[in-house]
């Protein structure tokens, strides 16, 4: 266990929290928890045009739903702009940065020349070692970058990473409108927050090299870095906010349990032997960066379905019902009464065994809680319309069964007698019972359902179905 570990998650509220961001948050949180450290949350909201309060709330709510809990107060990067400006000016005073008076037009022309020559663009500022022009000219602050040698750091996933300094230009630290750039703000915030370890995607590798130049210019000790491979879709294509990547709120709305999604994210690039189902307590106990692979992780919808089914079945029935009742009530348009919830509580175990998600489970549970008239699928309607006589026979015979005798043995025996007495097929009887009582053919044991519903509910449903085709 390491001493004094502080990690952070620093999303930009230009979109909802998606899988890649959630996995980054999870890995940082687990690393901090494993080492008895702190996990901080910073919202990088300095892009005022694309950031919004709604997206900030969405990110925070998604993390609450996932139960990834941060320590201390949430830090808004926009509240620290004066500190970022202070550091930029400090770099000027220490001759680690300079004012660049090049116009946007001049820079664009310079880029075009590099493109024509097929060269990697690197700005060569004519003002780097000159006196400023006369008058009130627009300017930016740029870092004095070393054009020789390499910038090297040890990554906890990929080992030693070396970037040729020729590729790193004199990056802008402060724009002409006096707003700090991402590269400067992140370094200042991470330093002030005491961040010791940064875990983020490999798409930040170049940013890390650039940020190390800023750390060096300021004489600050940088944190340790771990870059985790990106997540690809099932076809091996890179996920992004704009393509393929579902927001965490969409997984929630699709009926995925947070425990299942966390387990799924955990296994994307990290492993513990052959274990697939890993509880959050086990994850905290076992997590280490050296078990993160270097290859991109791929989405696997079948694995997510498997994990979700596992956690649904591991959750007690009362809790699951509490989760699906709002979905059911939205579907049927009225409040479910307490007696019907009792039916569902008695029968939900069989439904849980084969469900993929809570939405699917809610739909499969409708017949338990619907008032008459219940909903019928197309196959059930066809059976009902073509079996009026059988439904009448079932109603008449079942009406003779007393409440005290309404059990599995009596009902099974009566159905066998009906098959014999009326020269019909047993599967036809069961189809008619399913169609009239639950509105569909594919379902758990209809006898068990009838015992659960008890006499009056079953007779009322059969009577309604019979009378539909008078």
Curated annotation (Swiss-Prot):
<dbReference type="GO" id="GO:0005524">
    <property type="term" value="F:ATP binding"/>
</dbReference>
<dbReference type="GO" id="GO:0004818">
    <property type="term" value="F:glutamate-tRNA ligase activity"/>
</dbReference>
<dbReference type="InterPro" id="IPR004527">
    <property type="entry name" value="Glu-tRNA-ligase_bac/mito"/>
</dbReference>
<dbReference type="Pfam" id="PF00749">
    <property type="entry name" value="tRNA-synt_1c"/>
</dbReference>
<dbReference type="GO" id="GO:0006424">
    <property type="term" value="P:glutamyl-tRNA aminoacylation"/>
</dbReference>
<comment type="subunit">
    <text>Monomer.</text>
</comment>
<dbReference type="InterPro" id="IPR045462">
    <property type="entry name" value="aa-tRNA-synth_I_cd-bd"/>
</dbReference>
<keyword id="KW-0030">Aminoacyl-tRNA synthetase</keyword>
<dbReference type="Pfam" id="PF19269">
    <property type="entry name" value="Anticodon_2"/>
</dbReference>
<dbReference type="InterPro" id="IPR001412">
    <property type="entry name" value="aa-tRNA-synth_I_CS"/>
</dbReference>
<comment type="similarity">
    <text>Belongs to the class-I aminoacyl-tRNA synthetase family. Glutamate--tRNA ligase type 1 subfamily.</text>
</comment>
<keyword id="KW-0067">ATP-binding</keyword>
<keyword id="KW-0963">Cytoplasm</keyword>
<feature type="short sequence motif" description="'KMSKS' region">
    <location>
        <begin position="238"/>
        <end position="242"/>
    </location>
</feature>
<keyword id="KW-0648">Protein biosynthesis</keyword>
<dbReference type="GO" id="GO:0000049">
    <property type="term" value="F:tRNA binding"/>
</dbReference>
<keyword id="KW-0436">Ligase</keyword>
<dbReference type="InterPro" id="IPR014729">
    <property type="entry name" value="Rossmann-like_a/b/a_fold"/>
</dbReference>
<dbReference type="InterPro" id="IPR049940">
    <property type="entry name" value="GluQ/Sye"/>
</dbReference>
<dbReference type="InterPro" id="IPR020751">
    <property type="entry name" value="aa-tRNA-synth_I_codon-bd_sub2"/>
</dbReference>
<feature type="binding site">
    <location>
        <position position="241"/>
    </location>
    <ligand>
        <name>ATP</name>
    </ligand>
</feature>
<dbReference type="InterPro" id="IPR008925">
    <property type="entry name" value="aa_tRNA-synth_I_cd-bd_sf"/>
</dbReference>
<dbReference type="GO" id="GO:0008270">
    <property type="term" value="F:zinc ion binding"/>
</dbReference>
<protein>
    <recommendedName>
        <fullName>Glutamate--tRNA ligase 2</fullName>
        <ecNumber>6.1.1.17</ecNumber>
    </recommendedName>
</protein>
<feature type="short sequence motif" description="'HIGH' region">
    <location>
        <begin position="11"/>
        <end position="21"/>
    </location>
</feature>
<dbReference type="GO" id="GO:0005829">
    <property type="term" value="C:cytosol"/>
</dbReference>
<dbReference type="InterPro" id="IPR020058">
    <property type="entry name" value="Glu/Gln-tRNA-synth_Ib_cat-dom"/>
</dbReference>
<keyword id="KW-0547">Nucleotide-binding</keyword>
<dbReference type="InterPro" id="IPR000924">
    <property type="entry name" value="Glu/Gln-tRNA-synth"/>
</dbReference>
<dbReference type="InterPro" id="IPR033910">
    <property type="entry name" value="GluRS_core"/>
</dbReference>
<comment type="function">
    <text>Catalyzes the attachment of glutamate to tRNA(Glu) in a two-step reaction: glutamate is first activated by ATP to form Glu-AMP and then transferred to the acceptor end of tRNA(Glu).</text>
</comment>
